[in-house]
Amino acid sequence: MEKYVYLFQEGNKDMRNILGGKGANLAEMTNIGLPVPSGFTVTTDACNKYYEDGKELSSEVIDQIKEALAKLEAKSGKKFGDKTNPLLVSVRSGARASMPGMMDTVLNLGLNDEIAESFAEKIGNKRFVYDSYRRFIQMFADVVKGYAKSKFETIIDEIKVKKGVKNDIDLDENDMVELTNLFKSAYKEFAGEDFPQEPFTQLIEAVKAVFRSWNNERAIYYRRINDIPSSWGTAVNVQEMVYGNSGENSGTGVAFTRNPATGEKALFGEYLINAQGEDVVAGIRTPSPIATLKTEMPKVYEEFASIAQELENHYKDMQDMEFTIEDGKLFILQTRNGKRTASAAVKVAVDLVNEEMITKEEAVLMVDPKQLDALLHPTFTAESIKNGKVVAEGLAASPGAGSGKIYFTASDVIENKKKGIDSLLVRLETSPEDIEGMNSSKGVLTIRGGMTSHAAVVARGMGICCVSGASTIVLNEEEKTLKMPDGSIFKEGDYLSIDGSTGKVYAGKLEMQEASISGDFETFMSWADEARDLKVRTNADTPKDAMQARKFGAEGIGLCRTEHMFFERDRIFNFRKMICATTLEEREKALENILPYQRKDFEGLFEAMAPFSVVIRYLDPPLHEFLPKTETEIKELADDLGKTVEELHEVIASLKEFNPMMGHRGCRLAITYPEIAKMQTRAVIEAAINVTKKGTLVTPEIMIPLVGEVKELKYVKDIVVKTADEIIASSGIDLKYEVGTMIEIPRAALLADQIATEAEFFSFGTNDLTQMTYGFSRDDAGKFLNSYYEKGIFEFDPFARIDFDGVGLLMEMGAKKGRSVNPKLSLGICGEHGGDPASVAFCDKLGFNYVSCSPYRVPIARLAAARAAILRKQGK
């Protein structure tokens, strides 16, 4: 019989695939003798079985839960459902990959009306028991029935107003009894039934709810942006309750073995006296820093500090721990590798190597490539900070800087991003429902919550700035306004700027500056470069882009889109004259005017990137994209060409296409108008010769786009070679150049062995290859892809991560066929996928020579390539 339930003592840290991260770590801590409340884990296999069985728990799984519960009763000396000595449990999710705030938790499960009354009488602490009961009802209603927590928070706020108190902790035992009754009434009103009184029914419903939550909207979204497959499922951890809310000698907290914002080696965290764990991360009360525990409970602090160091030594990584103190006794509820900012991730990795705790390769594997994005983006300029007006301060919860219009709901921020509007998400406190809004924002500002609140943890993981706990700001959700300590009012749509490194909130929009990279980052990236096999190039159309990419470690240009050079006003006019020319003579005259611009641009690129190679893609988009749109532009062009406006309208109409993506573009333009390819070749080769004459090594790689037939490539290549060789011969310079093609039409991948006979390199244009393989338009796919994610048809955006099964198969076929006739064939990719870590790893697996990506993604690709090489060599 398959085992679906494991007691903590039966597992270990290597079983995270079936026990989930939390369950595996609870098992490990139990086995090394740490004070962990007893419990058991329902496996990820049980989760997958739940979905296979039509969202029902099988009798097998239920029977194994009963057996484990009986063993837990025996160990604890308490009985589940007993009136005077009840075993209460927490039910928590725990996926294989850490997903903070993504899944759901229920505490104090096992209470009902009779048990609460008898238990309170026995222990003589009515406030504690009914505080626990009302929390249980609220969590059960939220997780199991989908009843919004905010409805219950409103009831609590009404009681606090009636009593004239500010915090939950100031409510007495009678208030807790009243709250419990009000919560039960609210539950019945919403659910249409009384709150369940049978403890085992409560448990089974909670387990099913956690399994269900694996496929809630926010979990699906989080998985998609973090490349977590839905097939992994989540485990459920059922654990004996320990109570941080049993009095002034109890408490709960969250702490890290190092500072998750800076990486500094020092205990960092927060705790609340007389509270339960969810209070700390929910941000409902602002907690005390962990350092004050040293004076409040010195023995507990000493024990905790010792355990924290033991856990870091054991896991060889910074740990994020949850703990509870019950009547002066410390319990560890969880440990996991802590989420951290990008700068902290790099510092911790470098420090652990210097402390001889891990190797350089282990350090490289420790940092998520996507995190580096946060290190590469702008901060506020010193001048703007000096002149900026600070209107409030909160906690520096996630570093970096962000400016934007303030909005108070995640949905508004998401809509603004679609419109290209920079927004800050402002909330009392964030919840898991805000995840997509946070990811769409330039930063997050919360009124409540501490350094380990949901907002802080998730923002750090996403690499966006966050100021939390700005409690001097008054947020009016109905009027959508913020009132600052000085009395100033900011309305929805007004600009604010937040600095997540200092906690300061500024009026208006502050000026930003480029990030500077040095120190630990350079050390860390040098280790990555030692480990990787793939080269990393950049997609750059200007010398400025090329120089930025060089700063980030680019080793050449993998894609220069020549059409982008035509869009400046004086250039576009001459280019339009070329397009609208009706004779070869007119066209060549227009091209002669364009030639100097192109040559000068290429010289700048060659100089910026020397001595590395530069891949220049010849004209690719359909000609109609360059045509004049307004009547003024049309008349101006007609006058210059000596045509009437009507005649020019006819030319424009003749160039219009029904399906331009598959129309007159790419190599088809060079075949129809060979003079375009000649002009571009002259510009490339003459620029290379001019730069070479200055003593700079130049290697141009000329790339013919949209080839689907070897004869197309041969025709254009012959023009290129004839033109280039004539110029080189007359110059007296020994210049080497290469001619290759983009593989972006499925037919090109299928016939790559033929095409390779005429190509010195292949660059896979994964944007168009994905469009043509799926039959999707990248520009229109957003209209329906969300439905695909919601219905489980797609897990990932195929335009962001290579579809390994379809597009990837074509790439593999193209690579193998190409190298079968030309073993020295250079292989690369130049689509948006070149900066996606999973796609980079796929290219490493296929034996590609390089990937090419936008300048700001170069470090991400360098690290992804290093991780891929290390894991491949380890056989993983």
Give the ranges of each region predicted by the language model.
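Structural motif
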Residues: 237, 407, 424-426, 445, ...
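Extended, non-globular alpha-helical segments
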Residues: 393-433, 485-523
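Nucleotide/phosphate-binding sheet-loop regions of phosphoryl- and nucleotidyl-transfer enzymes
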Residues: 1-388, 411-415, 421-424, 431-436, ...
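Conserved alpha/beta-domain cores
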Residues: 92-93, 517-519, 527-876
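Glycine-rich phosphate/ribose-binding loops and adjacent secondary-structure elements
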Residues: 329-331, 431-439, 443-445, 451-458, ...
